[in-house]
Amino acid sequence: MGASILLILALQAVGPAAQLPTEVVLRVSGAVSQPLALSLQDLAAMPRTKVTAKEHDTTVTYEGVPLTNILQKAGAPLGKQLHGKALASYVLVTAHDGYRVVFALPELDPDFTDASRQIILADTANGKPLPEKQGPVRIVVPQEKKGARWIRMVESIEVVKLP
């Protein structure tokens, strides 16, 4: 009987297989048709990609969702919708500490840029969740020479149309 109780307690301590948190880690808003509130679980269910890049003299393989996929899911004007006044749209990415970076919407759209340019919202580095000081999600821009737009602890993405 004692062994049975120990087994039950051990199984309860281990619990079911680890699941990703369902709390919202990212909000997408602004000039989109479908504002989003995404959890790590939501992001894990989206099409993913890996990019390998140098950061502080270290080569890191990041995995996450292409930023364009998130913008498409939110209904941002991309592809054939990105013309005329919509070309003056930009994406404002904000971190937990208030740090912000801007991307012109056309520079993110594969119809306007080299398809090999993959800007991703990463949630893992070298197969592990991002450290607390970087995550839970961050933007990775592997082709840029400076890391100023590699924004950590991303909380929101806003699509803004200039008047």
Residue ranges and their predicted role:
Residues 14-163:
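N-terminal intrinsically disordered, low-complexity segments enriched in P/E/S/T
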Residues 2-12:
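Bacterial N-terminal signal peptides
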